[in-house]
């Protein structure tokens, strides 16, 4: 009997997990430390679990019935209110229609469809019109006005494409360009070319240049052979096969010859003059003779502001330069000559200029007369060595003669060149000789 009772108790617990209640699962999953329950207690717990499961099943079935009843009532109400209009629609569409009756929903499809950009392209014939062919405030109208605003008008009568003042040189260049273009176009015998004629207010330039080298080439045969509409206009650019086969450097030479202005031969006459106060410069203690700027900077290093020295310029186009101390550093300025006057800037008439160099140095000794960008020559740096006797003799001879008078002296030619070293040349006359015109 004991064995049978044990088998019965084992058979009671062996059942699928789906039929067990939550309390049974908890009991099976929880480790109990106490004694095992008796058969009567197990049977009571099993009966309680069955009753609980039955109650839960009935509640779930009632809820499902209520949901089905509510959905069916909504469908019936919709069918009753709207008639047969909703037949064949899905539940989602019916719910959207039902909600839309209480809360009106905008139709998004029409709004988005109108906001989408149009795929239609604006034709070139429509751009040629003076007025916009599209409805106002449309996307195509906006694009039409945008293109017309940012492109130049293709109209020969517009003032922007007309040149009012044309010189003879421009007329000749235009004739040459036009002839070259006609020669390049003659190779196409099947094409009728119509060059654009540009008129001015004064006269009709039939043989004149085309402003900007622009030509509208219209091919009549290509329009007839094409399958495009009659409103379409074709702009073709005809290029010559002869020029296409030419090397690049030959084309560049031709373009350079067309673009370069006519050349003129100029003849400039100079007069050579000796430095007027070479003897006074030689006797000035601030004159150091031949010296470069690096040696001058080494001498002026650490000297007070306004210290200066006069030296020969290292450049052949200039005779003298001054090195001075200002703004805590050593600076240099060339003495320029223009029209027998000496200054630190010969191209600026406002800058002080003097007929001799000693007068120029005397002017810049006063700090009040010196601008912030001009050299300050207040304290001369005394020379520490004497000049050679040969150099002193040259200064004395140059003080007594002129540049052309040196050639009359009975001295060797090498000595004449030595005496002419300190001289400058001044421009006297500029003669322009026109080149002979090339007949086209």
Swiss-Prot record:
InterPro entries: SH2, SH2_dom_sf, SOCS4/SOCS5_dom, SOCS4_SH2, SOCS4_SOCS, SOCS_box, SOCS_box-like_dom_sf. The keyword Oxidoreductase does not apply. The SOCS box domain mediates the interaction with the Elongin BC complex, an adapter module in different E3 ubiquitin ligase complexes. This is Suppressor of cytokine signaling 4. GO terms for molecular function: 1-phosphatidylinositol-3-kinase regulator activity. One of its GO terms (biological process) is negative regulation of epidermal growth factor-activated receptor activity. It comes from Pongo abelii (Sumatran orangutan). The keyword Chaperone does not apply. Keywords: Growth regulation, SH2 domain, Signal transduction inhibitor, Ubl conjugation pathway. CDD domains: SH2_SOCS4, SOCS_SOCS4. The gene is SOCS4. SOCS family proteins form part of a classical negative feedback system that regulates cytokine signal transduction. Substrate-recognition component of a SCF-like ECS (Elongin BC-CUL2/5-SOCS-box protein) E3 ubiquitin-protein ligase complex which mediates the ubiquitination and subsequent proteasomal degradation of target proteins. Inhibits EGF signaling by mediating the degradation of the Tyr-phosphorylated EGF receptor/EGFR. One of its GO terms (cellular component) is phosphatidylinositol 3-kinase complex. The lineage of its organism: Eukaryota, Metazoa, Chordata, Craniata, Vertebrata. Pathway: Protein modification; protein ubiquitination. SMART domains: SH2, SOCS, SOCS_box. Residues 1-29 are annotated as: Disordered. Residues 1-10 have a biased composition (Polar residues). PROSITE patterns: SH2, SOCS. Residues 12-29 have a biased composition (Basic and acidic residues). Residues 376-425 form the SOCS box domain. Residues 286-381 form the SH2 domain.
